[in-house]
C-alpha cells in the first residue's frame, strides 16, 4: 500500500505537494483610522500648472474660457432668498453620465504641456496622475461607512495613472436616483449660478440655462510624502477681491446644505459633510468654501464661509470626529500600496483596487477592455513623443 503524498512510477518516487500548503494571500491594505493616527505627513503646497475648459457640448479647450467670477450678494443682513428650484427642469441640461470620460480631458492637457513641466519627462515618469475627486475619496475612506469605490491603476512610461471605476452599486444608485435627489443636485448648480458672474465686476445672471457640461478645471502639482502628484479638479469660481490673485489661493468652492435647527444637526454636519468639503478643498489648496443653507422650500436663507484650514476646529474635541492626519496618512499609504503593486509597465494592464466599508482595500489584475482606460490616442502620442494627439480625441475613443 502506497503512503499518502507519494506516487511510485517506473521506480521513480515523486513527492506530491503538501495538502496543507496555502496559496500566498493577495495583498490588501487595512483602512482602520487607528492605524493612521500618526503625525501629519508632508504635503507640498499645490501649485497650478495650467487649466482647461469644457464647453456646453463637453468639448475640450486648453484655456480659461469657462472660468467664472465670485460675485456674492451684498452683506446687508438680509436673507439672499435665492430660489434654487427656479428653472428646474425646463432650463436644465445635465451632463450625460453614461459617457465614461475617465482621465481623457486631463490626458489631453498633459499631452499639450508635458514638454513644459518643470523637471521634464523624468519628473512625470515618477508621478501619479489622477483627478482630484479620486484623491478626495481616498482621504475620506477611513471614515466612510456607506459607499465603496474602485480605482483602476495602470503604469505607462513609469507614470502611475489612477482612474475611478463606477461600482455596480453606484451604477444602480445612479440609474434609480429618486426625483428629489435629482432636484437637490440641480439646486447645487443653481446656487453657483446665483453666486458667479461671467466677468469680474458684473452681477450674476440666474435667468439662463444650467448646463453641467460646462466646467473650468485647474491642473495642479503637489507631493504627498514621497509621491509626486499631478491632478486636476473642477473649480467653481475665482474671487477677484481675494488677497492674492495667484491660483489656487484665489479660488472659491461653493456648496449648499439644508438649514440647521439643532446642535445635533450641526454636529452631524461637522462630522460628515464638512469632512468631504475639507478633503475636496484642502487637496488643491482652495482656501474657502462658501455654503448656502436652504430651507425646505428650496430658498437660500443664509450664507456662511468656512475657511478650509479652520474646518477641523469644529470636530477637534469630538470623540467621533475626523482627523486630517488620518485622512492624509491613509492616502499616502494607499499611494505606496498602489506604487508597489502596479509594477508592470503596460498601458493595457489594469490593477483594480476595490474597497467596501468595513473591509480592507483589495486588488485584482485585468487586461484590455472593459478595464483598460488609457486611450489609444494618448498611448500612441506618448510612444511616438508627439506634442499633441494624432487625431482629435473623443471621450468615446
UniProtKB/Swiss-Prot annotation:
Residues binding Mg(2+) 2, per UniProt: 192, 234, 236
Start and end residues of each stretch annotated as Disordered: 1-37, 67-88
GO cellular component: cytosol; nucleus
Modified residues (Phosphothreonine): 392
Chain positions found as Phosphoserine: 394
Protein name as annotated: Decapping and exoribonuclease protein
Catalysed reactions, semicolon-separated: a 5'-end triphospho-ribonucleoside in mRNA + H2O = a 5'-end phospho-ribonucleoside in mRNA + diphosphate + H(+); a 5'-end NAD(+)-phospho-ribonucleoside in mRNA + H2O = a 5'-end phospho-ribonucleoside in mRNA + NAD(+) + H(+); a 5'-end NAD(+)-phospho-ribonucleoside in snoRNA + H2O = a 5'-end phospho-ribonucleoside in snoRNA + NAD(+) + H(+); a 5'-end (N(7)-methyl 5'-triphosphoguanosine)-ribonucleoside-ribonucleotide in mRNA + H2O = a (N(7)-methyl 5'-triphosphoguanosine)-nucleoside + a 5'-end phospho-ribonucleoside in mRNA + H(+)
GO molecular function, one term: mRNA 5'-diphosphatase activity
Amino acid at each position: 500500500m502506497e503512503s499518502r503524498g507519494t506516487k511510485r512510477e517506473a521506480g521513480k518516487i515523486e513527492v506530491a505537494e503538501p495538502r496543507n500548503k496555502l496559496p500566498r494571500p493577495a495583498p490588501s491594505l487595512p483602512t482602520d483610522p487607528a492605524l493612521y493616527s500618526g503625525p501629519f505627513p508632508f504635503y507640498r503646497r499645490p501649485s497650478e500648472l495650467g487649466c482647461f475648459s469644457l464647453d456646453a457640448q463637453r468639448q475640450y479647450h486648453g484655456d480659461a474660457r469657462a472660468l467664472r467670477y465670485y460675485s456674492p450678494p451684498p452683506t446687508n443682513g438680509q436673507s439672499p432668498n435665492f430660489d434654487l428650484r427656479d428653472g428646474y427642469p425646463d432650463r436644465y441640461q445635465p451632463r450625460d453620465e453614461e459617457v465614461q470620460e475617465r482621465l481623457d480631458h486631463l490626458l489631453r492637457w498633459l499631452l499639450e504641456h508635458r514638454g513644459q513641466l518643470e523637471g521634464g519627462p523624468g519628473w512625470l515618469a515618477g508621478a501619479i496622475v489622477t483627478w482630484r475627486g479620486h484623491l478626495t475619496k481616498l482621504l475620506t475612506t477611513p471614515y466612510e461607512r456607506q459607499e465603496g469605490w474602485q480605482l483602476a491603476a495602470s503604469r505607462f512610461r513609469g507614470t502611475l495613472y489612477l482612474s475611478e471605476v463606477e461600482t455596480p452599486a453606484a451604477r444602480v444608485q445612479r440609474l434609480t436616483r429618486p426625483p428629489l435627489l435629482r432636484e437637490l443636485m440641480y439646486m447645487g448648480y443653481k446656487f453657483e449660478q446665483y453666486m458667479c458672474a461671467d466677468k469680474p465686476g458684473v452681477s450674476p445672471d440666474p435667468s439662463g440655462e444650467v448646463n453641467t457640461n460646462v466646467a473650468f478645471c485647474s491642473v495642479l502639482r503637489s507631493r504627498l510624502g514621497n509621491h509626486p502628484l499631478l491632478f486636476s479638479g473642477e473649480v467653481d469660481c475665482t474671487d477677484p477681491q481675494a488677497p492674492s490673485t495667484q491660483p489656487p489661493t484665489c479660488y472659491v468652492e461653493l456648496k449648499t446644505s439644508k438649514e440647521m435647527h439643532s446642535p445635533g444637526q450641526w454636529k452631524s454636519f461637522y462630522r460628515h459633510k464638512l469632512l468631504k468639503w475639507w478633503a475636496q478643498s484642502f487637496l488643491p489648496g482652495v482656501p474657502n468654501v462658501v455654503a448656502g443653507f436652504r430651507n425646505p422650500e428650496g430658498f437660500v436663507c443664509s450664507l456662511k464661509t468656512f475657511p478650509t484650514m479652520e474646518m477641523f476646529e469644529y470636530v477637534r474635541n469630538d470623540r467621533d470626529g475626523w482627523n486630517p492626519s488620518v485622512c492624509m496618512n491613509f492616502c499616502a499609504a494607499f499611494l505606496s500600496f498602489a506604487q508597489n503593486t502596479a509594477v508592470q509597465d503596460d498601458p493595457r494592464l489594469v490593477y483594480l483596487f476595490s474597497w467596501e466599508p468595513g473591509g480592507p482595500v483589495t486588488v485584482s489584475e485585468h487586461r484590455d477592455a472593459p478595464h483598460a482606460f488609457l486611450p489609444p490616442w494618448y498611448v500612441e502620442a506618448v510612444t511616438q513623443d508627439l506634442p499633441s494627439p494624432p487625431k482629435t480625441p473623443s471621450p468615446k475613443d
